[in-house]
């Protein structure tokens, strides 16, 4: 009897632990925030089990739609993605993140026009000397096709033009490492990852990539960080979402990690990239 009781207690404990598990999958841009918030949440909710993974916005949306994970994170609106039924998902805006073009410092440039940036990523400009830099071949590093950061960048910079065929990388960290160590390279990453002194962050049309400029939309390259659930979240998931939207995360963790609180934004953007003043 005692042995049976011990087994039942053990099974109950496992069931409770499993029921408290929240798997978060998707945006690599949001991964840093989700991981840190998850770690902090566990300190005050020791029975919680939050697992955070990247994979890109496309993966996050498809996984949450399939019911394979509790939360899918994305840099893009669900309704813009093929194969995703946005009506079946619930959207929670958690933060805003800026996106910045970065180059290896050997290129010798610190500012490009939006047109020059577009011409580089479509293959029209192939040498840094064409934009005032060194006589050095340009090597484009793109993001993977499921990347929300790529979707935002191409939507706002390329305006429907076909990007050049290039090496593709999934994560912000990998892109930063490649650009910092490879002469001639250019790519783009989210603000929270652009803190390496070995890369050159580019201004666009003389406007610097700062959070303050994002808040007013002077810097156009930014996206919302979305948390998506399949329909109404269960109680445990809702508690974690409420924590993400609460003052501790929004006022402390979000700015500390280089993101921007939704409350700081002076503009709003819809799924068609239309921007209006709040």
Residue spans of the language-model regions?
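C-terminal motif of bacterial Sec signal peptides marking the signal peptidase cleavage site
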Residues: 9-13
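Exported/periplasmic ABC-transporter solute-binding proteins
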Residues: 14-58, 62-66, 70-278
């Amino acid at each position: 009897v005692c042995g049976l009781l011990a087994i039942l207690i053990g099974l109950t404990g496992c069931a409770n632990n499993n029921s408290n598990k929240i798997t978060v999958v998707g945006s690599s841009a949001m991964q840093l925030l989700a991981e840190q918030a998850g770690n902090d949440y566990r300190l005050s909710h020791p029975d919680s089990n939050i697992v955070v993974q990247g994979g890109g916005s496309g993966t996050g949306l498809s996984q949450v739609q399939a019911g394979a994970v509790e939360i899918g994170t994305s840099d893009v609106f669900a309704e813009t993605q093929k194969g995703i039924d946005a009506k079946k998902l619930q959207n929670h805006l958690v933060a805003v993140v800026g996106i910045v073009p970065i180059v290896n410092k050997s290129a010798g440039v610190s500012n490009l026009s939006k047109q020059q940036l577009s011409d580089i990523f479509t293959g029209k400009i192939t040498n840094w000397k064409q934009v005032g830099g060194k006589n050095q071949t340009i090597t484009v590093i793109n993001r993977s096709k499921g990347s929300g950061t790529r979707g935002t960048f191409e939507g706002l910079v390329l305006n429907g033009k076909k990007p050049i065929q290039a090496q593709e990388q999934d994560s912000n960290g990998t892109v930063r490492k490649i650009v910092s160590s490879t002469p001639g390279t250019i790519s783009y990453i989210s603000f929270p990852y652009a803190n390496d002194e070995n890369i050159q962050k580019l201004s666009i049309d003389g406007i610097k990539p700062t959070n303050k400029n994002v808040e007013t939309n002077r810097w156009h390259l930014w996206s919302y960080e979305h948390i998506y659930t399949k329909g109404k979240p269960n109680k445990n998931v809702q508690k974690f979402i409420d924590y993400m939207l609460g003052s501790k995360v929004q006022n402390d963790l979000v700015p500390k990690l280089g993101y921007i609180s939704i409350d700081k934004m002076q503009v709003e953007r819809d799924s068609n990239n239309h921007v209006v003043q709040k």
